[in-house]
From Swiss-Prot:
GO terms for cellular component: cytosol; small ribosomal subunit. Binds directly to 16S ribosomal RNA. The keyword Ribonucleoprotein applies. This is Small ribosomal subunit protein bS20. It comes from the Bacteria. Disulfide bonds: none annotated. GO terms for biological process: translation. Belongs to the bacterial ribosomal protein bS20 family. GO terms for molecular function: small ribosomal subunit rRNA binding; structural constituent of ribosome.
Length: 98
């Protein structure tokens, strides 16, 4: 356990940041899973409503990833990799190769 006040304060700050980061990461993962499941649903039953659902879930996930990078929860390269994964999954479903 920390002995001086500054070390105690750093422990409190680290715990506060850990909890905040955990909520960002959790909601980001949830939105990514939602996007992947929307892609699967569109792949099994294509339609305009399913396509709109895929695009909306992609926008929400991108927004959450960008916010996580902005506040320092994720490194910008990690955020770019996550967005790339989502984009390629959506592109694969919406633009099938002929």
């Amino acid at each position: 356990m920390a002995n001086n006040n500054s070390a105690k304060k750093r422990i409190e700050i680290a715990e506060r940041n850990r909890l905040r980061n955990r909520t960002y990461k959790s909601s980001m993962r949830t939105l990514m899973k939602r996007c992947f499941s929307a892609c699967d649903a569109y792949g099994s039953a294509p339609g305009e409503e399913a396509k709109a659902s895929v695009q909306a879930s992609l926008r929400e996930a991108f927004s959450k990833i960008d916010k996580a990078v902005k506040v320092g929860v994720l490194h910008r390269n990690n955020g770019a990799n996550q967005k790339s994964r989502l984009s390629s999954a959506v592109r694969k479903v919406l633009e099938p190769t002929s």
